[in-house]
């Protein structure tokens, strides 16, 4: 509902902008763009302003052409002031890169307008940044490979225009949930794209669409496009979570859209607790846990620690996060084969797993499978996420949720009773022999088995304990290969014996 209201509001702004096109053109001429080079972590202090063509500013501001140059670009604003995230991001960058030139691109006067008008100004602001970079190259021999543009929302597309207009190739552009309205589906030269820098990484945190509009752009537009929690539904940003703190429905949108900034700040401040994303074709496949591979550069750090991958473009990557900093957690792929030995009438099990590790244990974690339906006599693959590092897995406790007092459970029970007439004889019984696990962050594989093979049965309200029985997974293809070699060897054995016999006869004839 909130998403639809916001989308409708943006669409109405577009209508208003069309009716007031003359005022839009005049405003763009009056707007000012400032390059505020930070000397202090406190944004309340004025800082030092770089101005194209004024060489004395370089010495006054202490600009170091041999160091990294990081430009931070805000987006659309309704308040006309820097939002709190800007203070946090500037502070985090300056603490991580103490020698870097940190410059805040201030285009507040051009961003505090109707949304479509602010969109129309992004090209002009991008060109202004490009002019500044060209001048710095001429005056200081600034290497563009050391330049990193970080843009949030509309600021991401501003960075894209800067990369288009600059003479040369910028080292890196990071897009923090680039704006979606008026950019979704646009030509590459009219938005941020992978051609705008040597390395373009994008974080998508609010891609939920309504009325054909998404606050954050949905399509992949960079070299790598990372979708935390599928790109929407960020933990800690639900209506219940946000309203208890802010009491404003707009804060729900702000929380998810702005989460990209906080994930980036987290990557700067918690470099010893880095978050990993995994290449996958879509959120549904990632939810199955089948994309936790790091082979051939299929995984990457997120945020500031992301690294360029060769010959990659529009690579979609996914991860789950915690609700608060540090946002990083731990991903596990689990494969569980469930047998229905009694051919029960629609047992429809709901499973939970409790993980026991070398450092810690988890509480029960819901086994989330596609369509919320456990496949019987089939292998079920699913993703498990833990917020804490529990160490190497030692034991898994699998529980089948018992029947509850809910109406759905009562109706399901009545249906089973009616069909079977005798519930005691038709009590659903399933078997789970083993669970295979792959840890995404360490890439380690383990197999967990039931200690006593006579006790593999599980029914509603019961649990099974599986212990680690081997490192790695069984390699069935290898066994088939070995059996093939064995068959070929024994089929070839008579020929070898015959050859050996003939050879012995010839040797005996020579000796005589």
Enumerate the predicted regions with their spans.
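Short, well-ordered amphipathic alpha-helical segments that serve as non-catalytic structural scaffolds
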Residues: 128-133, 200
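Alpha/beta-hydrolase fold nucleophile elbow
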Residues: 142-152
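The conserved beta1-alpha1 loop
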Residues: 73-77, 152, 177
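Flexible, membrane-associating and regulatory peripheral segments of lipid-active enzymes
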Residues: 2-104, 110-121, 131-144, 168, ...
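Glycine-rich nucleophile elbow surrounding the catalytic serine of serine-hydrolase chemistry
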Residues: 150-161
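The feature captures the conserved acid-bearing segment of alpha/beta-hydrolase catalytic domains
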Residues: 170-171, 177-234
């Amino acid at each position: 509902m909130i998403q639809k209201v916001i989308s409708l509001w943006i669409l109405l702004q577009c209508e208003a902008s069309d009716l007031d096109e003359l005022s839009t053109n005049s405003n763009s001429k009056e707007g000012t763009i400032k390059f505020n080079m930070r000397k202090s972590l406190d944004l309340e202090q004025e800082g030092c302003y770089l101005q194209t063509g004024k060489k004395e500013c370089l010495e006054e501001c202490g600009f170091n052409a041999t160091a990294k140059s990081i430009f931070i670009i805000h987006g659309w604003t309704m308040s006309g002031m820097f939002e709190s995230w800007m203070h946090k991001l500037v502070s985090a960058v300056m603490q991580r890169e103490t020698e870097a030139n940190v410059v805040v691109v201030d285009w507040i006067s051009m961003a505090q307008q109707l949304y479509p008008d602010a969109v129309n100004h992004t090209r002009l602001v991008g060109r202004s940044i490009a002019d500044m970079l060209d001048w710095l190259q001429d005056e200081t021999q600034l290497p563009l490979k050391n330049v990193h543009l970080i843009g949030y929302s509309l600021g991401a597309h501003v960075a894209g225009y800067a990369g288009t207009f600059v003479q040369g190739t910028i080292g890196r552009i990071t897009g923090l949930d680039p704006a979606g309205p008026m950019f979704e589906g646009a030509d590459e030269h009219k938005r941020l794209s992978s051609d705008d820098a040597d390395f373009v990484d994008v974080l998508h945190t609010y891609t939920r669409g309504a009325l054909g509009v998404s606050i954050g752009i949905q399509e992949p537009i960079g070299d790598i496009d990372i979708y935390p929690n599928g790109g929407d539904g960020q933990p800690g940003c639900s209506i219940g979570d946000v309203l208890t703190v802010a009491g404003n429905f707009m804060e729900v949108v702000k929380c998810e859209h702005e989460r990209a900034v906080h994930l980036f700040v987290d990557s700067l401040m918690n470099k010893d607790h880095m978050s990993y994303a995994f290449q996958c074709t879509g959120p549904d496949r990632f939810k199955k846990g089948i994309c936790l591979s790091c082979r051939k550069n299929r995984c990457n750090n997120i945020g500031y620690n992301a690294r360029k991958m060769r010959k990659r473009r529009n690579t979609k990557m996914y991860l789950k996060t915690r609700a608060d900093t540090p946002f990083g957690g731990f991903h596990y792929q689990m494969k569980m084969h469930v047998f229905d030995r009694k051919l029960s009438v629609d047992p429809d099990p709901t499973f939970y797993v409790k993980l026991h590790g070398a450092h810690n244990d988890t509480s029960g974690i819901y086994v989330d499978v596609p369509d919320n339906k456990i496949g019987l006599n089939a292998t079920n693959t699913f993703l498990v996420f833990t917020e804490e590092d529990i160490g190497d897995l030692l034991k898994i406790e699998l529980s089948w949720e018992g029947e509850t007092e809910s109406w759905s459970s009562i109706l399901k029970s009545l249906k089973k009773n009616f069909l079977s007439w005798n519930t005691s004889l038709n009590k659903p019984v399933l078997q789970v022999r083993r669970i295979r696990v792959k840890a995404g962050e360490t890439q380690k594989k383990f197999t967990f088995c039931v200690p006593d093979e006579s006790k593999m049965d599980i029914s509603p309200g019961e649990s099974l304990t599986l212990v680690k029985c081997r490192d790695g997974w069984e390699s069935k293809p290898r066994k088939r290969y070995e059996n093939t070699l064995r068959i070929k060897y024994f089929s070839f054995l008579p020929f070898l014996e015959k050859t050996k016999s003939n050879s012995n006869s010839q040797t005996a004839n020579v000796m005589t």
